[in-house]
């Protein structure tokens, strides 16, 4: 928000609205895409889009065309939706029925730890080098997220046999263990 105001001379509310509106529009289509190509590939595509958005945003200035700025904020929103819609279901797919809570705890611990640490680290970098390091910093870490996703071997979509698909009395474990 401070970056948008001080560096880009944009209303930070508008930049967030653009990103959030794009994410909201993307949530359902992203779910359908993941159903076709898989969650891992969809997340990787989202990480690439987010890295591109952050990488391009690192070169934006107050003199950059508003359309380009808005496009990057929209791309970031779509990318974030692409990642978020698929991440938690992947975690649930990794867990057996009784371990869903444990895996949910791991997921949120890692996610929240990053949300606590990165403002401090990026803040230190911005204090030392200026606000212009924010988007390159973000691009580097989203690029690293891409690398870590390459090592993910499980948690993608599982086909549910047709005879089980309509059975509402079955547990998640019964549906996923053939």
Model-derived segments and their meaning:
Residues 26-39, 126:
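Helix-to-loop junctions at the C-terminal end of transmembrane segments
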Residues 36-48:
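Cytoplasmic membrane-interface "Motif A"-like loop-to-helix N-cap segments
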Residues 124-142:
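A membrane-interface helix-boundary motif in multi-pass transporters
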Residues 82-96:
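Intracellular juxtamembrane helix-capping segments at the cytosolic ends
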Residues 1-13:
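Short amphipathic helix-loop junctions that connect adjacent transmembrane helices
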Residues 97-107:
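Loop-to-transmembrane helix entry/capping segments in MFS-fold secondary transporters
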Residues 139-169:
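Multi-pass alpha-helical transporter architecture, strongest
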Residues 49-63:
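C-terminal ends and interior cores of transmembrane alpha-helices
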């Amino acid at each position: 928000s401070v970056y948008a105001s001080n560096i880009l001379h944009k209303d930070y509310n508008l930049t967030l609205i653009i990103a959030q509106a794009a994410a909201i529009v993307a949530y359902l289509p992203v779910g359908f895409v993941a159903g076709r190509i898989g969650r891992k590939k969809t997340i990787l595509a989202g990480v690439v889009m987010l890295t591109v958005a952050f990488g391009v945003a690192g070169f934006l200035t107050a003199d950059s065309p508003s359309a380009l700025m808005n496009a990057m904020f929209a791309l970031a929103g779509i990318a974030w939706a692409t990642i978020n819609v698929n991440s938690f279901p992947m975690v649930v797919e990794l867990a057996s029925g009784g371990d869903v809570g444990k895996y949910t705890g791991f997921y949120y611990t890692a996610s929240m730890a990053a949300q606590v640490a990165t403002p401090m680290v990026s803040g230190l970098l911005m204090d030392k080098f200026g606000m212009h390091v924010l988007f390159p910093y973000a691009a580097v870490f989203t690029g690293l997220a891409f690398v870590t996703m390459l090592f993910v071997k499980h948690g993608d979509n599982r086909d549910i046999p047709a005879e089980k698909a309509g059975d509402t009395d079955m547990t998640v474990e019964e549906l996923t263990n053939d």
